[in-house]
Structure formats: C-alpha cells, structure tokens
Amino acid sequence: MGARSSVLSGKKTDELEKVRLRPGGKKRYCLKHIIWAVNELDRFGLAESLLESKEGCHKILTVLAPLVPTGSENLKSLFNTVCVIYCLHAEEKVKDTEEAKKIAQRHLAADTEKMPATSRPTAPPSGGNYPVQQIAGNYVHMPLSPRTLNAWVKLVEEKKFGAEVVPGFQALSEGCTPYDINQMLNCVGDHQAAMQIIREIINEEAADWDQQHPIPGPLPAGQLRDPRGSDIAGTTSTVEEQIQWMYRAQNPVPVGNIYRRWIQIGLQKCVRMYNPTNILDIKQGPKEPFQSYVDRFYKSLRAEQTDPAVKNWMTQTLLIQNANPDCKLVLKGLGMNPTLEEMLTACQGIGGPGQKARLMAEALKEALTPAPIPFAAAQQKAGKRGTVTCWNCGKVGHTAKQCRAPRRQGCWKCGKQGHIMSKCPERQAGFLRVRTLGKEASQLPHDPSASGSDTICTPDGPSRGHDTSGGDTICAPCRSSSGDAEKLHEDGETAEREPRETLQGGDRGFAAPQFSLWRRPVVRACIEGQPVEVLLDTGADDSIVAGIELGSNYTPKIVGGIGGFINTKEYKDVEIEVVGKRVRATIMTGDTPINIFGRNILNTLGMTLNFPVAKIEPVKVKLKPGKDGPKIRQWPLSKEKILALKEICEKMEKEGQLEEAPPTNPYNTPTFAIKKRDKNKWRMLIDFRELNKVTQDFTEVQLGIPHPAGLAEKRRITVLDVGDAYFSIPLDPNFRQYTAFTLPSINNAEPGKRYIYKVLPQGWKGSPAIFQYSMRKVLDPFRKANSDVIIIQYMDDILIASDRSDLEHDRVVSQLKELLNDMGFSTPEEKFQKDPPFKWMGYELWPKRWKLQKIQLPEKEVWTVNDIQKLVGVLNWAAQLFPGIKTRHICKLIRGKMTLTEEVQWTELAEAELQENKIILEQEQEGSYYKEGVPLEATVQKNLANQWTYKIHQGNRILKVGKYAKVKNTHTNGVRLLAHVVQKIGKEALVIWGEIPVFHLPVERETWDQWWTDYWQVTWIPEWDFVSTPPLVRLAYNLVKDPLEKVETYYTDGSCNRASKEGKAGYVTDRGKDKVKVLEQTTNQQAELEAFALALQDSGPQVNIIVDSQYVMGIVAGQPTETESPLVNQIIEEMIKKEAIYVGWVPAHRGLGGNQEVDHLVSQGIRQVLFLEKIEPAQEEHEKYHGNVKELVHKFGLPQLVAKQIVNSCDKCQQKGEAVHGQVNAELGTWQMDCTHLEGKVIIVAVHVASGFIEAEVIPQETGRQTALFLLKLASRWPITHLHTDNGANFTSQDVKMAAWWIGIEQTFGVPYNPQSQGVVEAMNHHLKNQIDRIRDQAVSIETVVLMAAHCMNFKRRGGIGDMTPAERLVNMITTEQEIQFFQAKNLKFQNFQVYYREGRDQLWKGPGELLWKGEGAVLIKVGTEIKVIPRRKAKIIRHYGGGKELDCGTDMEDTRQAREMAQSGQVPEA
C-alpha cells in the first residue's frame, strides 16, 4: 500500500476530488479510482511507482497511447485516469477528464517531435506496437519485450479464455509478425486443449489459403516467392521473409495480419467452448442492478463471432428485451434507440444499493419484531429434550431417517395401515377436517351418521384411540374437562357460554374442545380481563373486537372488510384467554359489526384450516398441438420470500391443494411472493404466462356481470359466497404435471422442493372457464328443482331471491349451502348475508329497491392523468343510477397523447362539472326491479353541450338511467347524435332484459323522417313516440334538394398557396357580381369555407350556391347544428337566417360557366389550374358498366372525392347502407350457391367467398339435375373443395350429392345470417339484381343481361383486399396457393440445415444463414431479411444442432455428382 498511498499528496488529492469524470457530470474522481489504476497497471507489466511522478506518468502514457484506439474499455479508463494524475503532477488546472486528455496528448505529441529522426521508430501502417521498426531506411525486427509477453500470459491465466482474451490479443499483437505471434502462443504453458483447437484452425485456414492461391510457375533467380499457408503460420518462413512480404513495394502480403485473423478465429472458438453462455440467455435478474446486467451482456457479446451490424442489433433490441420488468418499463420510456449512458443513468436506482438497503431495512425491522411464541412451542422450550427414539424400529439413539432397519409399513404414529404419519388423525388436529371424496359429512345437524364432520380442535389433542365420531359431540377427554362445553353445541346455539378449561394430555401436549361448524363458531374470550364473544374466522388475517378499552398505547390502522374500510387501534402483546388457554398476540379495536379472531390468533392457538376438494369430475385439458409445457428456471428469491412461500406451500399441501412433484417431472414455472394490502402477510403468485401461451384456448362463458335492474322483484333475498373457489375444483390429473414449480433454498443448502397443483391454480387461463362450467353443472339441477327461485351466480358470488315464505326461503338457502358443502365447496359464514342491505357486485340490495354502494369522489391537490381516468370511471359507474352525471369537460383534460403520471391542469368548465356531479351524488337515488308483463320504456332527454341522459323505466318505476356524450364527428347535429343514443339503449336493453323498450324521443316525427329519408345510415330503427320535453331536437335550416328558380346563383371557390400559406376566397354570381377576400395563414379547406360564408352573407333570403369542394359539401349536407369550428358556427348562423338554400357541387371548372370564372378569379398568383380531362371518360365508363369508386380511381387516376361524386351523382347507384353480419369460412376452395328469381326466370348464383368472384346464369328449372350440371360446370373452371348452400330441395337432392361426391367436395347447409350461413351469396344476389337494373336497357333477354352483369361485377368492381377486382383477386389467390405449396415442398429439404459462409476476400467465416436452395455451383441462403448467393467453395452446410457431417467444405470434401443426383431425386441432404 506504500505506493498507493503516496501517489498524490494531500493537496493534490483535494485537487483530484474536484475533477469531474465527464464534462458537466455530477460524479468526480476519488481515491478508489487511483487504487483501481494501480491494480490495472500490473496487467500491463508497469510498476506502481510510476504514478508518483510526472515523468513516470509520461512513461505510462507513451506505452498506453498506441493501444487506446483498439483497446478495451478498461484500457481506455486507465489511460484517462493516468492523464488526470499526470496533469495534477504537472500542476495543470483541469475541470474534467476530457481537458486532462487534451493536455496529456499535447505533451506526448511535443515530445515525439523532439526525438531525432534516426532514433524515433516509424510504426508500420498496420499497428501501434513496434516489433518491426524502420531505422535509417531499413526495416529491423525487434523481438517482443518480456513485458508484452508477461501481459499476454497474465491475461490468459486471469480470464481463462473469457471474452476479454480476443480484444486483448488484438491489442498486444498489433503489428506483429507470425514469428512474434508464435512466440506469444508458445508462452501459454497450460490450456493445451485450447492450443490444439487453435492449431486445427490454423491448419484448416492454411489449407484454404493454398487452395485459393495456387503455386505459380518457376520464378527468376533472386525473386522472392509468394507465401504459402505454412509460411503465413511461420513454420516454413524466416523473420526476414515475413518482413519482406509485409513491406515490399509491389503486392505486399500482410502475413502478420492474416495470421492474427486465423488466431482470432481459434480464440473465438475457445471462448465459446469455455463460456457456453449464449447471448440470448443473458437476462437480468429481478433484483440485479442494471449495470451488472450490462457488464454480463457485453462480456458475452464480445465472445459472439458475428459482424458489427448484428452486434449493433443485439445491443439495441436484446439489451432492453431481456431486462427485468422494472428496468424494461423505464427503458421503454426513453424512446427509440437510447444511448447506453442514458440507459445506465435511468436505471441506476433500480436493483442498486439504495433499493437493497430499503429491502434490508424492511427485513431487519420485521426480524427485530418479537414474534409471539405459541403455547406448544413455549412448553417445548421450557422442558428438556428427551432421548431420541427411532419411530421405525423403536430403538434409542438414532432417528427414523438414520435407521437402517427395513421400513415399517403403515403409520409411524398410531401403527394403523392406510395413511402416513404426516396425515395421522391422532397427530394432526385442524380447524377443518379434510373430508374424503367418497364419504362426505353433512353440514346440517340432522345427519347423525356423519363421521368426520368439520370440527375445530387445537393440535395434539386426544391420545391414541381417541374417539372423535359424531359430528355434533365433544370428544371424551375434552368433555370431561370442559365444564359446560357440552351445552355449547346443543341445537347449534346456547344461551350461556361458560369459559372452557383445558387439560394437559400428558407429554402429548394439551386437549381442547372440538365442536361442529354447522353454526358459527362463536366462543367467549377474555382480553386483558374483559370478557367478549368472538367469531373464530379463518378468512380474516387480523383480529378485531369492539366495546373494550385497552389503554392509549396503540397504533392507528385502517383495515378493509366487507363493509368497507374501518379505522382501528392496534395493540400489541395483549393477553388473551380463550378455551382455557392464555396467549399473547396483536389485536385491534374498532367499530366492527362482529368481533373476530383472525388467523394471527388462531395460528398461535395451533388451529389450521383444511379445505375439502370438490367431488367434481375434472375437465380434460390439453396443450396446444405441437407444444410442450414451460421449462423456465426459478429466479433467485430473498430469504423472507422463501420462508413465506415455504409456509404457504406446506399449508396448501396439508389441505390437499398441492402435492410433491416427482423427480421425473421436467417442467417448471417461476414462483414469487408479494405483500398483501396490510403489508403483514404474503401472497404466493405463479408466473403462468408461458403455460398460458401453450395451453389450449377456452371459451368465455360469462360475457359480463349481472345488473340488479334486470332482477325480478322478489320477497326475500339472500347472498352467499363460495370460499377459495378455485381451490375447490380439481385439476385434470394428466395436466397437473405442467403446473410444477420449485421452492429454492437459501444459499442452495438443499435441493429445491417441487410441487404441482391438484386444484385450479390462480393465474392460469383455464381456471375461470372451468370454474364457471363446474358451478353451472352443480347449480343446474338445483335451478330445475326450484324453478320459482332466482339464482344469480357470477364467479364465487351467489344471489338467491324468491317469493316464498321466510321458512321456505331459508330452507332453500340451507339446501343450496348443503349441496355446495357436499360437493366440497365451502360457504364462509362471515360472507353469508341474510338480512338487508345486501352488498353484491358493488350494489346494495333491498327486496323492493337497489342502489349503488356509497361513492366517495377523491380529493387531491395534484391530479395526474391516471387520477382523471379513475375519476371518470367512478362517475360512469354512478351514471347508471344518478341522472345528470356529466364527464365531457373532465374527459377533455386528458385529450391527446399523455403519460399516466403527467400532471393535469383543471379548467373552469371541468371544475364546475365536477362540483355539479358532487352535488348530484349527495342525493339519494334508488332503482327498482323488473316486473314481468309491464311494458319497458326508455325516455331520452337532451342536456346542454351535446350531452344526453336517458332513463329506462316501467311506468314511474325507474330501473336504470344512463348518459351519452360521445361525439364521433367534428360537425354533427342532434338527430345523428340521437340515433347513436337510441342504438346504445337498444343494445343495453337486449343484454339486460332481452327486449327492446318503447322509446320516447325529444324530436318531431317530421324532422326525424326527413333526416332519415335523406341520410339513412343504420339497419335498425325502433318503435318510438314523440315527447315534447324541451329542448327539442330540430333541423335548424331548410336545405332544399332542387335549385330555386328566379334566385341568384353564387359560384364559390377558395385557394391557398401551400408554401406561403396565403390564399383567396370569393364568389361570382350569374348576374355579374363578384367578390374576392385575401386570406393569410390559411388552408385550402378554410379558404373554401370562407368563400361559402361570403356567399351566405351577401345573398338574400333564398339562394343557390354552387361549390367545387367536397369538404364544404359534406359539412353542409349533414345539416350540422353543433360544431367546434368558429367558422362553421358562423356558417350555421347565416344558414338559419335563410328561408331556403340550395347547395350544389360540380367536379370541374372547365366549361361550367360561373364556376370556371370564380376559379380564375381566386387562382391568380395562388395556384396552378387543375386539369381534369379524364372526368368525362370516367363518367362515360360509369354510365356503361356502373363500376365502383375504387375502379374509377384506379383506371382514370381521379381523386377519390371526384370519383365518389361521379358514383353518387348516378341515380342508379344510389342505395342505402347494408347491415354488417358475422364472418364466414373464407378458405380458397369455399363457394356458396343459391337460386334467385327475376322476371319469372330462375338465376343460379355461385360466389367464391374469399374473393367475391361470381358465376351466374339462367337455368330452365330449379331442379336438382340443373343444379348438379351447373356445379359440374363450376368445378371444371375453378378449384372447389367446399360448397355451402341453404336447405332447398334442389341443393339437398340426390343429383347434387352425387355430383359433389364425384368431384370430391364437402357440402354443408345452413340458415341465413349465421357465421356458417350462405349470407355471402344472399348479399351477392342483391348486388346482382342492382347491377342488372343498371344495365337492363342494354340487352333484350334476361339470359344475356345476367352474364353482362356478372362480367361487370367481376372485372369492373375494385376494392376490398389488395384493392383488386374479384377476378384479379381470385387468380392471385390461386397463384399464391400454388407458389406456397411449391416452396413448402422445396423448403422441406433444406429446413434443417444452416450455412456458414465467406464473402469476397474476407477470410472470416460468417453465419449461420438459413439454407433456401442448393445448386451445383452455388447455394441460396437467407441471413436476417437479406437473401444472398454464395459460391459452393465458400459455404459450409451443417445441421443446425451441430455435430453432423459437413457437406460443403470444398471439392475435396464432397462428391459433387452424388450431391447433384441426391438433389435431383428430391432427397434431403444428410447432415
């Protein structure tokens, strides 16, 4: 340490601590950097004392400077540190590392220039070392220094052929000759296996060199020969020859660099052998610091033999992809391609010392908290341990595990057969007995023969031979010592509950009362001398009592229960006396509806909860075809989590929910633990994501939650809960193996214990569906037997409602509970609700009414986007019962792309809306239940700002209310919004009640009919009545369809220069009037609107306006009354003032009178004239064939707006919208066929489902023979494998069946508008008839016009997938299918092979690439997304799993003729 401590004096040390590591950074140099630099110097053979002076640092820098450009990160860091120390010795003031480097490099350059030219070595152009030096014009070889050789040997010995060896060799061998490189290799004494691998690579590369560089003819005397492979390797050449080859004037051969590259290939192979970790396996642990993960990643990356582009891709994708979830979340927020410095800075706090310190502090706090010692444990501590006796042979001095005698059969505890000691009834006393599936005990007290009833007893209760039969009795030893304990269970309840005493059961512990659970287990206890009655509740984590005072030494705490959150006082180390036993535990006091002893006290008493497993047949489950179960290693866990998981798993194993996995089970899924809400208990979680991916898919059996408004009104209601629902359903035994998980041990002290689930696990994708299916099977018989009783079941919540008498209703509930208990389901008493109000699914229910549970809006100083989202969710939930709830302005606060944690600034409108909602929520609102036979009605009311409210009711009884505030269009009107409201209510009513209500809408029938006649957009209009509830929905202005006669006509236009944003808007009238307005910072659309507004302002009460803008026409035609645009709002106000308005649209300016004139008027200096010569041919084409919009756009190059207007202007192409139906089978060979009728003729139509291609013709009769002939004609033209028709007589005839059988196609039948129906051909019949109507006047006979219409539909109708016509699409699909089949057949030969290859003069092998094709002279390979052609002599083909026979190493390694014959015969090449 002498040199280390004397590197810098005290003053210089102070100066060092002021220097920053990076310019502008926060971190500064400290002493640890000097200590690190001293250790690193030893690797380069440099003395530590050199750092003590300026001259010594200068010497270090002269050695390191040539190595910096090709050196590792450690080398560069060492160089930077020495630069800083050099500046401190030279008394140079520096602020950061970069300044120090500049100063040091300036001094190095000056010293080099001062050296004499004859003595200064001139480095060859290839490197920074100087084995070959140019002195006086001659190249002289200087042997490698011992320092260099020592550094190389130390590198190999320390790193053991790690990833650092390759760049280290590159740096140390820079500029070396083969002689020098061989000297370096000979210095490595050990690792001869690695040396042999390098020698084999050298021999292989030398042979390739000789093959590529054949020996030329005889050379003239005195001329230097060209190097052979052995010359490059230094075995048959001298140092002088090597120098001449490297530095000759003509055709130099860098033998040193070539040999270095061969050695690098060998070293990389050794690195992969010594370090088998793949770069893909480098993943960050859950608590691993990000910097440590990055170090491991780059260490493995440096060992990868691939090009820099691939390494760059690995850095950009794998580094983030394989980070743990915490770091990955932070890294994704950095955007695309963050730098490594940004990633390290962002993740430095995750998994680092700070986080570890917090975890350690939390663990230490928990460890220092004195845990209450159970009574039995205290007894064992108090007494001395007796002599060890073997349970197997009975001898003293060893345990059963050490016993060498044959294993005794049966139980080691009681000697009986049929069970093992861990499950012995005399050893294990539980809160609930585990009931077998074969013989179940009744939960009701009237079953006297129920043996094994659920009981409570403390551990080590009765002695051997103890009789515990009889579900409602107390065991004999307990009965003899419990005083009045027999009265406790007499008829399930007792008027007087006396304290019970317990007796010590000899040396076996103690005996406690055991009592039936057919009633609530309520006992009397004394807490610090204060008597209370408490419920023993195994479902509660903590213990809470009311009505007692325990002093002021408490901690305030809030706990959650059925009724919400409760404020409590927590007292620790409180003395409790219960069932004759004293314990000390933590207890809370507060306003609880019932006193509860939870698991913290029950565990101290030694009580356990044993759940039965349901007697339900397991549902068979399989993995997806070709998939295997998860095999993911368990990641490291902290000590406290391991202990918590161990306790949880042991408990679940005792309860029959888990069992040990056999050692032959190869599957594993990671497990971990998290703290519960109270932060005192742990919850076990299994990461089933991989298992969910490979598990078969399940059907969602329940698509939503039930709503109380859909319940029928009943006299009595009861709510009960199924406890630990998933853990009551058995899992398919054949599938259990895939749920295996492992509990690791601390410091790997023992093998991890492995478990598999016997019941439905939480987190597995199949658990919800299987549970719902099982519950439906259990409840269906009960529902049928009690048809007058309503049973609503959602997951583990069950609601029972009936009009029966109280006694009959209670009997039904008891029968249902008994049924569930007999099937193995538990029904916890603490969640059993017999009296109103019933808390169910977020609602409070009474027999005659329902309401929402209390809603409390949050009060916050600072609001984030996430807070606003939660607030809107609460308000939307409340809107189903509270009328008038609005969220429009609150939702506007989070419009646009915002992060969840971004702070939100409230607007005045949003604050006012929130306050109004708070006032509404303060009022009491109640809903009613549904009454059969009473008409269902829906009343809609319009509020301000386009917000709508509605109520669904039966007379004056309100069932449900709601709101609607979605505005899908920027410019809209009330009728369109009203239509959306009606659709929403209709869907809602169908789901809840299964019927459509009668609507009361605030609109006049004339307004509604007028709007829907012109702008029909939906397929369903309900029955409705007019309601005169202001404000009424009205159409604000009179927009007529035909031009007004004797009224001035305005031609409007606007234009804008995109570069300058300057524009003009104006109009020209048919009476010679015109006007132009100059605009700034505008757009074409805004200019068009300005021109329209000018025409409205300057015109009279009646006006004709002609526009050439589809944008303006679309806005005006929709008759908007609401808009967010000030300009459109101005237009609306002007239009309201008019008596009548006609608005027309023209597509072109040429030859259209005033429209052409106004275009010239506003275009001067603004835009060029748009030539639309192709409009007239497009109109002629459409009048002939009536093609669609996309066909006109494709063929004539028209803008889509112009093409759309051409189609819309055609009176024969005007049609209403069509309903959207279910999906159909769209495979390539699927056709649908149907018959339709027109003009007394029968037209048979066949449609190719995938492409929409149609075949149609007129047939004489609708018979099976004619249909079969058409089917044969269709099959002779197109591939057909599946035909779908309706159930008509001609399609089900024997003729059609025989034709289908002969062709080899599958025929199916269906009904309209089902997913497997003939809906495609039904729709095509409609389109065919429309097309025939358009061209009917072009042909005489119906036969001709049908074929003409089919031609138009197949070749003149473009759109859909690929923007093709149906004919193009069908041909494309057939061609694609053939290509796929061809390439699949070819690819099967090569799919198991990979190719390593070399390119150009580069001798480095690259790959692997995927083999696509193997020809005689070359192979076709795929590398990433790039496809390459590689000569055979530069390619090696191997099996991807390695170890196979190489096929292409050159002409001497494969018989070309044999390979060609094999490829031609279609065989797969052998590996």
Curated annotation (Swiss-Prot):
Region (Dimerization of protease): 513-517, 561-567, 600-612
Bias (Basic and acidic residues) ranges: 105-114, 484-501
Protein name: Gag-Pol polyprotein
Protein origin, superkingdom: Viruses
Residues of the site described as Cis/trans isomerization of proline peptide bond: 217-218
Integrase catalytic domain segment(s): 1224-1375
Co-factor: note: Binds 2 magnesium ions for reverse transcriptase polymerase activity.
Positions occupied by motif Tryptophan repeat motif: 1008-1024
Domain Peptidase A2: 533-602
Site description Essential for RT p66/p51 heterodimerization, residues in chain: 1011, 1024
Binding positions for Mg(2+) 1 per the UniProt entry: 721, 796-797
